[in-house]
């Protein structure tokens, strides 16, 4: 294989299985696993569920995939609003669907283990 003409190009995009980007606080996995090990039963019994444990002052915007150029400005504004406590440019429901721990919570709600 001759690669001397340098015509090849490679690109890598970060994405997750559900193809939605992630924005917000970085979740503390070990603490959430301890807090939510019984999430399925708590929800079934309609008991209060505590807020998810996150690392303080550690935030992320990740998994933008192939649409990162179009979604990055809105996600950047969302993250700035989270950090500074300003009104969010997106709804709470959308923000929940973009949280970094969403896959873990879905499994815990089904009663499955997360490793």
Curated annotation (Swiss-Prot):
InterPro entries, sorted: FAD/NAD-bd_sf
Gene3D superfamilies tied to this protein: D-Amino Acid Oxidase, subunit A, domain 2, FAD/NAD(P)-binding domain
Top-level lineage group: Bacteria
Name of protein: Uncharacterized protein HI_1536
Phylogenetic placement of the source organism: Bacteria, Pseudomonadati, Pseudomonadota, Gammaproteobacteria, Pasteurellales
